[in-house]
């Protein structure tokens, strides 16, 4: 089960990482992955009709971060147009917000590898 907030909503954070697109604010929930067809691999995350969510663009966007995560982990230099990456990520987040059940809060956060400051803090997607 996802993190239960005082208002009864579950909090999901979009923050790309290696083989993950986001996480719950609850420590006992594993990070969220996504199948190559764009299906979100978590039965507790559902759309307005209670059905699983499929977003191929979320999968493609998340996969872009993987070479940077690897480079960062071994101390190799990397380059990324963070402004563009985050604009596309926010566009995806807003699209997800439109189809995501109102049982969820949706947040967007920059990955730890991003030192640009483009996204300086976790942002609520409304």
At which residue positions do the language-model features occur?
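Intrinsic low-complexity, intrinsically disordered or marginally ordered coil/linker segments
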Residues: 1-126
């Amino acid at each position: 089960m996802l993190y239960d907030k005082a208002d009864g909503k579950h909090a999901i954070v979009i923050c790309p990482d290696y083989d993950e697109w986001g996480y719950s604010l609850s420590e006992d929930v594993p990070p969220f992955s996504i199948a190559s067809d764009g299906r979100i691999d978590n039965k507790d995350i559902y759309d307005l009709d209670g059905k699983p969510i499929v977003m191929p663009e979320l999968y493609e966007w998340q996969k872009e971060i993987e070479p940077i995560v690897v480079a960062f982990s071994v101390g190799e230099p990397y380059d990324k147009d963070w402004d563009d990456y985050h604009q596309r990520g926010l566009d995806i987040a807003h699209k997800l917000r439109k189809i995501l059940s109102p049982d969820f809060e949706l947040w967007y956060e920059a990955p730890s590898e991003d030192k640009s400051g483009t996204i300086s803090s976790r942002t609520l997607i409304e």
